[in-house]
């Protein structure tokens, strides 16, 4: 089936299939479980014809793969590639593996770009996979080390490659960490947004820019790879 889905019934019913070549920003406050939300979306309906490339600036590649294993996904038979920007910043000289390629740090955009390109070549050219998903978690970490113009150029390249490959990209941004101009500049690269906000002791999400009107806000919980939505209670 052409296109992609989020694996969240209420949102997928509203959005329909997400067209190939789409890039989305996921933006929300700290501690809103964006990492888990992102991984759950990426893991939805992974098949033999699906490739996933995850740039991790928060945790080592082994921990990312461990999450997928915990969800019952056979890593050895999957097409999952992790660009690990963490391990070598901790002074650990861990080697690359078939599923994990190490960048020296989140500031090493050239190295990160090379590793992403290696996985894209493996999945799209050598294996000729039909679908590719790319995520960067998070852009905010990268922006701590590089200026906006440099990050914009880097993103322009890879959002363009996602479009050219008929893929699906999701890129995480921490709300409240950046000024309005930074967010406005980054938004130019994306087709829409997954917005997250706090509601009391919980968090709610909606999708903006993919249809004529934003979706409704839904509170969410995450159990493993399952995302459970509920409409916020009215005061």
Region annotations inferred by a language model:
Residues 3-66:
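Glycine-rich P-loop/Walker A and Walker A-like loops and their local beta1-loop-alpha1 context
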Residues 25-29, 54-56, 83-84, 135, ...:
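Conserved beta-strand segments of the P-loop GTPase G domain that flank and frequently precede/overlap
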Residues 31-32, 58-62, 87-90, 139-141, ...:
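Conserved nucleotide-binding/hydrolysis micro-motifs of P-loop NTPases
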Residues 51, 79, 130-133, 164-172:
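Loop/turn-to-beta-strand initiation segments
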Residues 58, 65-106:
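Nucleotide-state-sensitive switch-loop elements of NTP-binding domains
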Residues 89-157:
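Phosphate-binding/switch loop-helix module in NTP-utilizing enzymes
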Residues 150-177:
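Substrate-engagement module of ASCE P-loop NTPases
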Residues 167-168, 172-235:
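Phosphate-binding/switch region of NTP-binding enzymes
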């Amino acid at each position: 089936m052409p296109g992609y889905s989020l694996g969240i019934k209420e949102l997928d019913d509203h959005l329909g299939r997400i067209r190939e070549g789409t890039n989305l920003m996921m933006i929300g406050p700290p501690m809103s479980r964006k990492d888990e939300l992102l991984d759950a979306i990426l893991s939805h309906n992974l098949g033999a014809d699906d490739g996933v490339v995850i740039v991790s600036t928060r945790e080592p590649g082994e921990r990312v793969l461990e999450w997928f294993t915990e969800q019952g996904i056979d890593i050895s038979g999957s097409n999952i590639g992790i660009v690990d920007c963490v391990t070598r910043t901790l002074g650990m000289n861990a080697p690359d593996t078939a599923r994990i390629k190490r960048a020296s740090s989140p500031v090493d955009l050239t190295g990160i770009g090379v590793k992403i390109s290696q996985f894209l070549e493996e999945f799209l050219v050598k294996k000729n996979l039909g679908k590719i998903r790319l995520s960067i978690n998070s852009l905010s970490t990268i922006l701590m080390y590089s200026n906006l113009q440099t990050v914009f150029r880097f993103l322009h390249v890879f959002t363009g490659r996602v479009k050219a490959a008929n893929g699906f990209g999701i890129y995480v941004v921490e709300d409240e960490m950046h000024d309005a101009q930074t967010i406005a500049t980054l938004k130019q690269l994306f087709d829409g947004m997954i917005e997250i906000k706090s509601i009391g002791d919980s968090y709610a999400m909606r999708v903006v820019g993919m249809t004529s009107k934003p979706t409704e806000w839904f509170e969410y919980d995450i159990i493993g790879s399952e995302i459970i939505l509920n409409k916020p209670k009215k005061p």
